Amino acid sequence: MKLKISLIAPILLLFSFFFAVESKCRTSCPLALASYYLENGTTLSVINQNLNSSIAPYDQINFDPILRYNSNIKDKDRIQMGSRVLVPFPCECQPGDFLGHNFSYSVRQEDTYERVAISNYANLTTMESLQARNPFPATNIPLSATLNVLVNCSCGDESVSKDFGLFVTYPLRPEDSLSSIARSSGVSADILQRYNPGVNFNSGNGIVYVPGRDPNGAFPPFKSSKQDGVGAGVIAGIVIGVIVALLLILFIVYYAYRKNKSKGDSFSSSIPLSTKADHASSTSLQSGGLGGAGVSPGIAAISVDKSVEFSLEELAKATDNFNLSFKIGQGGFGAVYYAELRGEKAAIKKMDMEASKQFLAELKVLTRVHHVNLVRLIGYCVEGSLFLVYEYVENGNLGQHLHGSGREPLPWTKRVQIALDSARGLEYIHEHTVPVYVHRDIKSANILIDQKFRAKVADFGLTKLTEVGGSATRGAMGTFGYMAPETVYGEVSAKVDVYAFGVVLYELISAKGAVVKMTEAVGEFRGLVGVFEESFKETDKEEALRKIIDPRLGDSYPFDSVYKMAELGKACTQENAQLRPSMRYIVVALSTLFSSTGNWDVGNFQNEDLVSLMSGR
């Protein structure tokens, strides 16, 4: 009966999905705002530290997100106590079907959960939330420990109004009321109450969600999550069909199982990869005969979580013995082949045994780290050669879209989205994993694009782990044109990835490679960073930048958005690693940029003069 139960489980899961098809957390939104009440000598520096949104030294490039949303602040060093500061942050789906963002807080002397919630986070979170999301007892929080601080957020509700798409997470205070918040926000009391049903605005505590304004003072409209997906009715139809099919499979397979129990193994290999990978127990390559001849002890001893072990026979069969017609790419450590394995499209990287360090690096990272903007590892094989099996990402890599021929040019809004997705993937491995990982080979060729033109960071073969905020000394590794200056001395830190990401931002703007051929003469090459640095030195910086913007964009871009991305690229590629922003800052900056760029669609403008005005030309 064990087999029968295992088949019923996914069916029950599908039933639960059917009844919960209208999820409260169908999608995230690029940006939300936190209302931080200033008291007891709180400064922007404190807010910056607690909510991880850098101010200095990047405000010289006029890209500071806090100041953009607080035009009333004339001097960041002198702010009136008792006022509120709006702090932008990403609003993301969290486990448990709700929206929020996890900030990291380093515990200081005399900190308690209550003090952190009230004093350090201005009631944007609660003591109960901190206790629930951190392993430390309330009476013994270690000094310098890192706390996960959840701040909830909202992306709006089109059933209430489509006029509002940016929301402020607003902690209520004793002096607040429904009418006072309506006056200060410019939103009717009825709308506020409908966005916060059942909430008593006069309670003096708790969180409400208030429509917010963009840096131009306008209310961004709600962006429906349905535009890129399918309706609930379609989903319901698909689910019902799948359930019927699974019931039929249950009957056939269980009948065959009872008839011949020896065929149980063939059933195991028929389970879809995504299901099997999610439920595979942690195994060791040393046990169970998984190691093949020639496998090094280091490989044989690695522990693998949630990954499928494939046989060489199965991989060879799926690729016609690794026929060239199945080859879809070639990297520094091996070739990549397309395959269909157990009903799922996959990409197989075949590596020589000499690349065991790179194999282990990818295996260790991708079996422990899971994020929507990181490529998913399905499984591995260590017979004869080293094989890693990934999810197949249909649209190739970013470099192919920017530098290759035969593809439609990426619209500017998609370029900003790809930059934001990639930044979120990197922020995750830099900020939210223990230990912290440094990718060390960020480049456009290692950013994969799916069918919806969303990005996933891939190729973790050079990844190194470091202590939080730390660095390590290693050999210089990476790709020429993307390597930060300090890598010459073997220094590795998260700022190495930041530098390379800055080069990718320049690529998104110009569609040029990281190394540019300046003339037809032999040897006339220059780094893309140098090309942009030269443009920033020109008297007319804007005109100089226009000359290197991808000509395939034509007039279909808002110049202000391009200029701001170029300035962010400049901040990322500063020679001094300490002056580069963190990936957390970059995510907030790009979220802000995407929020303003996403509303811009040149296709809505038929008048050529309007098009020129919008593009800044």
UniProtKB/Swiss-Prot annotation:
Annotated Protein kinase domain residues: 322-594
Membrane spanning residue stretches: 233-253
Biological function: Lysin motif (LysM) receptor kinase that functions as a cell surface receptor in chitin elicitor (chitooligosaccharides) signaling leading to innate immunity toward both biotic and abiotic stresses (e.g. tolerance to salinity, heavy-metal stresses, and Botrytis cinerea infection). Recognizes microbe-derived N-acetylglucosamine (NAG)-containing ligands. Involved in the resistance to pathogenic fungi Alternaria brassicicola and Erysiphe cichoracearum, probably by sensing microbe-associated molecular patterns (MAMP) and pathogen-associated molecular patterns (PAMP).
Glycosylation sites: 40, 52, 102, 123, 152
Regulation: Activated by chitin-mediated homodimerization.
Family to which the UniProt record says this protein belongs: Belongs to the protein kinase superfamily. Ser/Thr protein kinase family.
Name of the protein in question: Chitin elicitor receptor kinase 1
Subcellular locations according to the entry: Cell membrane
Residues holding chitin: 109-115, 137-143
SUPFAM superfamilies: Protein kinase-like (PK-like)
Residues the record lists as Phosphotyrosine modifications: 390
Tissue expression pattern: Expressed ubiquitously, with lowest expression in pollen.
Modified residues annotated as Phosphothreonine in this record: 479, 519
Disruption phenotype: Complete loss of response to the chitin elicitor, including loss of MAPK activation, generation of reactive oxygen species, and transcriptional activation. Impaired chitin-mediated resistance against biotic and abiotic stresses such as tolerance to salinity, heavy-metal stresses, and Botrytis cinerea infection. Reduced resistance to incompatible fungi such as Erysiphe cichoracearum and Alternaria brassicicola. Enhanced susceptibility to Pseudomonas syringae pv. tomato DC3000 associated with peptidoglycan insensitivity. Impaired chitin-induced phosphorylation of PBL27.
EC nos: 2.7.11.1
Enzyme class: transferase
Occurrences of domain LysM (ranges): 46-74, 108-140, 168-211
Catalytic reaction(s) noted: L-seryl-[protein] + ATP = O-phospho-L-seryl-[protein] + ADP + H(+); L-threonyl-[protein] + ATP = O-phospho-L-threonyl-[protein] + ADP + H(+)
Signal peptide (from-to): 1-23
Factors inducing expression: Induced upon treatment with chitin oligosaccharide elicitor and flagellin (e.g. flg22).
Subunit structure: Forms homodimers and homooligomers. Homodimerization is required to trigger plant defenses. Binds to chitin, chitosan and chito-oligomer oligosaccharide elicitors. Interaction with chitin octamer (NAG(8)) promotes homodimerization while shorter chitin oligomers inhibit homodimerization. Interacts with Pseudomonas syringae hopAB2/avrPtoB. Interacts (preferentially when unphosphorylated) with PBL27 at the plasma membrane. Binds to IOS1.
Modification after translation (UniProt): Autophosphorylated. Autophosphorylation is induced by chitin and derivatives. Ubiquitinated and targeted to the proteasome by hopAB2/avrPtoB of Pseudomonas syringae pv. tomato DC3000.
